[in-house]
Amino acid sequence: MRNSHNITLTNNDSLTEDEETTWSLPGAVVGFISWLFALAMPMLIYGSNTLFFFIYTWPFFLALMPVAVVVGIALHSLMDGKLRYSIVFTLVTVGIMFGALFMWLLG
């Protein structure tokens, strides 16, 4: 014999909980746009010679794109959906990651 009680559900009881707001799409867009801005910064600083540098190192910079998107999602959710703060912090964070990779590849 088991020592348990039967659980009865009535129509008043709901099994669904209140869903939290998701911030993945705006954060992903912010992360991708900040990756594009970070990709353009070496071209603005060093000019057209950067394209020859990117010919050999494009896989490294392409690998930063999903990282930038995840950083955008994470920072947007940490900022409780405040778009202005998440844009600023994502741009700074992705720019630092991009700059660190660029300086590491330059030697």
Swiss-Prot record:
NCBIfam families: PRK10726.1. Residues 44-52, 107 are periplasmic. Residues 1-20, 76-86 are cytoplasmic. It comes from the Bacteria. The chain crosses the membrane at residues 21-43, 53-75, 87-106. One of its GO terms (cellular component) is plasma membrane. The keyword Cell membrane applies. It is found in: Cell inner membrane. Keywords: Cell inner membrane, Cell membrane, Membrane, Transmembrane, Transmembrane helix. It is a multi-pass membrane protein. This is Inner membrane protein YgbE. Its main location: membrane.
